[in-house]
Amino acid sequence: MLNVTMLQTPSVTLDGVPVSFPFKRADALLYYMLVRRSATRQELISLLWESCDEATGLKNLRNTLYTLKKTLGGDFLLSPQKSLVVVNSAWEVDCDYDRFTQQGDFSAYRGPFLQGFAVKHAFSFDEWLDRTREKLHEQYLGRLAQQA
């Protein structure tokens, strides 16, 4: 089982063993895909390699997808169409983000979304991260107010 913590300092474990990716963009791709579930290759390139030309961005994305596959030991992300990347629904994933947003588990929120996580020179990712962090914090505060 893949366990991913995103609602505090992020962490990833696979069958209880901590997972460490060799570069931050691999972590970022995993986190983004867990939130979005599917994205076009162009969207991912624009998000993580916005300063690269298209060919270099595509090469970097392929390399990062391979790195995720190698590190996780399987196809967590699939590309059913040449232009699309999706999370493989056959994987068993426990993620605090899903518990909070989809299952309404108030206790899953233990801190800011991807607290302390950053990717150098990925301004689009940073913007997405800030928007998502703010949205989740507002949801948390709203639920907290409902309990009062």
Q: What is the predicted function of each stretch?
A:
Residues E43, N60, R99:
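Ca2+-coordinating acidic residues in Ca2+-binding motifs
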Residues M1-T5, L61-A90:
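DNA-binding patch around the recognition helix
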Residues Y32-L44:
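Short capping segments at the starts of secondary-structure elements
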Residues V17-F21, R25-D27, V35, C52-T56, ...:
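Intrinsically disordered, charged and Pro/Gly-enriched terminal/linker segments
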Residues P22-Y31, E54-G73:
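DNA-recognition element of transcription regulators
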Residues M6-P18:
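Short, Lys/Arg-enriched N-terminal segment that forms or immediately precedes the first helix
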Residues E43-C52:
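DNA-recognition alpha helix
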